[in-house]
Amino acid sequence: MTVDATRPAIKPLELARLMLCVPFYIMLALMVVEALLSAATTYLVIKAGRDFTKDELLVYDLLLILGIQSASYVVGAISWIYAERAGFLAYGRYMLRFARDNRDQTKSLGDKEMRERVEPFLTGETFYVYFNLLYEIEGDLRLLLGLVFNVIVLGTQIDGSLPAAYAAAFVVLFAMQWTMRKKISRAYLENQRMTNRMTAQGYTAWDNVFTGNRYNLHLWLAGFKVKLRDGLDAQIKAIMTKEGLSAASAIIGLAIVFGTMAWVAGNNADDAETLIALVATLPRQIEMTHNMHQFTSGWNEFLAVWTRLGGVAANMRPAADPNFEARIKPDRLTLREGASSKTVTTVDAAIALVFAQRTGRINVRGANGSGKSTLLTSLKSQIKTRAYYWPTADRLSFKFSQAMEPEEMDYGDEEPKQPGDKRPGFSSGERQMRALQEIVTYTDAEIYLLDEWDANLDPNNRAAADALVEELARRARVVEISHRDRV
């Protein structure tokens, strides 16, 4: 990946901070309340066992246990609502940050390799990474808080060796996970890379399927199969690495905790209250042992998600090709203004020519591969917000298309299925005209860079579009590449 030395790299922690908001803090507070209620239930179960030995157990005690444990479930469910809010806010902040950091990087617009690498993060990967990270944070904290508060109750109400057993099991299990963290992170990073590579192939599916060309479809399917197989292999390797360690740590955790419980029972063989408390809390302690295993194994899951967040961060500020302007062949380009034609040797010379007049049209001409579009992109990257750039194949947002789904945007020359049916969406030419009308009506730039603005227009619409471009040229400078004027 090309590194942009002019812009410092984004760290995963910076992106994680985007989750810090009011809903996130409410989620944390609710999780503490949930864990306290769960620990209170454990205390009441122990108390009920002791009351049973004294024939003092009341129905009220059972109802109280039911009520407090139910309240714990309700509070836990509510916390998920705030987790969802925090996730959506984090993703929204990410998109705003990405837009702010890259709005001046016009040179990257036509970089297909970069687009294939970065676009999956914009279209879904980052959204799922944030939610996976939130779910890991909430899940792990819920387990940790529940363990801490319940272990305190067990230690104070049954035997002080139980907290020591849980602490020892936690240290052993965590150490096992820690020693494997790098191997698991590498496996998941490779899994992410292969999955993105596979899903990026889908961006070209539409053209290869619906053109009906067997040659192109065969090549596309062959490439997809290779990427699908590589993605599956990487995912299986990542899962097996994590789950193998998970199974081993679960067995060790059970052995430590239940060995200690057996030792406590043996030392208190004549203490009915202690034995009943152990039996009464056995389901809870099995749950706690499972939760401890989940928490320590979840640490590597957290690291795996954190690694994926690192992938998001690494693609937050993609660097343009340093040899971008080498694609421009000045000796093969002509800049025509009215009846005069000029050639330029550098982008700076082209900028000087553009700023020589405040209005008027400059037509960029040259053979295919001479760098006409690259010149316009380079002009935009240097002139920045003083120029409005309309590239050849655009997915720019316009008012006329805001209420439409993406698949409704372009139907080419497709005809209605039945006589009298209204064709949904716009044809390429209709979209071109509406976009140009919006540009004329709602934008106010010093310079307009129009790349093949007439590419999809019939003669009548081309004349109308030319009039709109002429209107722009009366109030601003227009640098254009015309489809009609291709050499």
Region roles according to the model:
Residues 89-108, 115-119, 189-229, 305-312:
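Short cytosolic helices in intracellular loops of multi-pass membrane proteins
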Residues 21-75, 155-163:
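Transmembrane helix-loop-helix hairpins at lipid-water interfaces of multipass membrane proteins
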Residues 18-19, 124-133, 213-258:
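An intracellular "coupling" helix at the cytosolic face of ABC transporter transmembrane type-1 domains
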Residues 1-38, 83, 128, 144, ...:
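Membrane-integrated ABC transporters
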Residues 103-149:
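Juxtamembrane loop-to-helix connectors within ABC transporter transmembrane domains
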Residues 153-166, 241-312:
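Helix-loop-helix
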Residues 68-87, 167-190, 275-306, 312:
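Alpha-helical transmembrane segments of multi-pass membrane proteins
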Residues 377-382, 428-448:
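GG-anchored amphipathic helix commonly corresponding to the ABC/SMC/Rad50 NBD signature/C-loop
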